[in-house]
Amino acid sequence: INNMEQMGSLFVDYKIVFFYDQSSDNTLDITLERMKSNNKIFVLVNGFHKRVKERTHNLAHARNKMLDFVREKCSNYEYFMMVDGDEVSSSKMDIDVLKRTINRKDWDGITFNRAGEYYDLWAMSSKRLVLSLWHFEQPNTSTIFRDEIYHEIRECKEGELIHAYSAFNGVGLYRTKKFIDSKYDGLPRLDLIPPFLIERTKEILKVGIR
């Protein structure tokens, strides 16, 4: 919450919206207590949607509910953010990176690399590896994907962006006008991916690690 409030302070106004499903700790109690000192915090509680075994479907439901909130309460905001509410997003953030990013015009949606190992491999779809690593048999696929992503990061010059079809990594910033009508379904959409990109991914996996 501290990080979210710090990010929110960069804007003229902000709202922090949590979607609460279930947890084994005191997440909800902590959030409700924080609401007493910050009236910009809102909690949406999952009361009717039945959780399913597919994690992506549960995430899609939660994010769609938050997008509904954006459409109803914040449609005039220039940006909205999606942030994982776990320990990954609780570590110290370089707020200056976000400041510089807001002033750039060369992105519609952007996520941020982190110091250390890239943890959100399953959500990554790059120009060379357009399919998720979970479309392929393990155990070597994760290593190949990780090697490719680190190669792109090493080759990226300071100030440049890495183009991606999909990425998250815990914090995402989106231009509201571009994504206001978006909806998550949690389903694989191979019909949206050009066949040559699928074949490119397969070829890279055949060759293996750089």
Outline where the language-model segments fall.
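Phosphate/oxyanion-binding active-site loops and adjacent basic polyanion-contact surfaces
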Residues: 1, 27, 54-63, 206-208
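Short, acidic, metal-binding catalytic loop of nucleotide-sugar glycosyltransferases
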Residues: 2-13
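Conserved donor nucleotide-binding strand/loop of the catalytic core
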Residues: 32-72
